[in-house]
């Protein structure tokens, strides 16, 4: 599933990130949750997200490395909130690691 894709020759910087999830459903939920976010400056940035198996794949194209860095930071902040919501609604207890 692609959330938003804009092709422009000026978008010469590109980065792709792959975020693994516990299940295919979680990756799909994350992808769908990111889809409403519109890019305000589409001439400077393109972001596309899709889920594949248990992975969320986000591809960024931008006019500069700074633009991409800010976009990635924003997506990661949004993903943090999405994951916290999934954890809360899933009702799983936190795993606490102890030394053996």
Curated annotation (Swiss-Prot):
<comment type="function">
    <text>Component of the EKC/KEOPS complex that is required for the formation of a threonylcarbamoyl group on adenosine at position 37 (t(6)A37) in tRNAs that read codons beginning with adenine. The complex is probably involved in the transfer of the threonylcarbamoyl moiety of threonylcarbamoyl-AMP (TC-AMP) to the N6 group of A37. PCC1 functions as a dimerization module for the complex. The EKC/KEOPS complex also promotes both telomere uncapping and telomere elongation. The complex is required for efficient recruitment of transcriptional coactivators.</text>
</comment>
<comment type="subunit">
    <text>Component of the EKC/KEOPS complex composed of at least BUD32, CGI121, GON7, KAE1 and PCC1; the whole complex dimerizes.</text>
</comment>
<keyword id="KW-0010">Activator</keyword>
<keyword id="KW-0805">Transcription regulation</keyword>
<dbReference type="GO" id="GO:0005634">
    <property type="term" value="C:nucleus"/>
</dbReference>
<dbReference type="GO" id="GO:0000781">
    <property type="term" value="C:chromosome, telomeric region"/>
</dbReference>
<dbReference type="GO" id="GO:0000408">
    <property type="term" value="C:EKC/KEOPS complex"/>
</dbReference>
<keyword id="KW-0804">Transcription</keyword>
<dbReference type="InterPro" id="IPR015419">
    <property type="entry name" value="CTAG/Pcc1"/>
</dbReference>
<protein>
    <recommendedName>
        <fullName>EKC/KEOPS complex subunit PCC1</fullName>
    </recommendedName>
</protein>
<dbReference type="GO" id="GO:0008033">
    <property type="term" value="P:tRNA processing"/>
</dbReference>
<keyword id="KW-0819">tRNA processing</keyword>
<comment type="similarity">
    <text>Belongs to the CTAG/PCC1 family.</text>
</comment>
<keyword id="KW-0779">Telomere</keyword>
<keyword id="KW-0539">Nucleus</keyword>
<keyword id="KW-0158">Chromosome</keyword>
<dbReference type="GO" id="GO:0070525">
    <property type="term" value="P:tRNA threonylcarbamoyladenosine metabolic process"/>
</dbReference>
<dbReference type="Pfam" id="PF09341">
    <property type="entry name" value="Pcc1"/>
</dbReference>
């Amino acid at each position: 599933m692609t959330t938003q894709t804009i092709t422009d020759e000026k978008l010469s910087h590109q980065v792709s990130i792959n975020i693994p999830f516990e299940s295919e459903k979680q990756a799909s939920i994350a992808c769908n949750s990111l889809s409403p976010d519109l890019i305000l400056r589409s001439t400077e940035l393109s972001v596309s997200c899709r889920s594949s198996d248990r992975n969320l794949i986000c591809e960024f194209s931008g006019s500069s490395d700074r633009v991409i860095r800010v976009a990635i930071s924003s997506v990661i902040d949004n993903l943090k909130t999405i994951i916290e919501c999934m954890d809360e609604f899933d009702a799983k207890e936190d795993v606490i690691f102890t030394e053996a």
